[in-house]
């Protein structure tokens, strides 16, 4: 999955260049300790004692379009169970509540590890999937888990012709 970057200009987050680690940000008039990272797309991770779909949706509707995130942002709330297990709920930019996310899983794991709360190898539980994440010494993140068939689509000729133009 690559490496996580916590640098504000790589996420991106407005303001001076800095690593966004355990920084306070306000969403919906409530301050949260946040860690932001890019794992190819932007993520906001909030450590909490309790997590739920309702809570991530409440925060996500504000954080997704907050002015400090010029490219919008995916939001994860996480609960660390122990040094090798964490739970996360995900709110994806442009999609809303999401049952599972590979990049969200990696961002959550990278944030928890960077905060010193987990070992480099951990299990991440999401509502529709459990993944194993390993953060190697060089920072590379490896994601392992099951995949499942979701569905299929048929694309019309107009759409496939447009793809050829790209």
Where in the sequence are the language-model features?
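Active-site proximal loop and beta-alpha junction motif in alpha/beta enzyme cores
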Residues: 1-99, 109-166
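Helical hairpin unit composed of two closely spaced alpha helices linked by a short loop
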Residues: 103-105
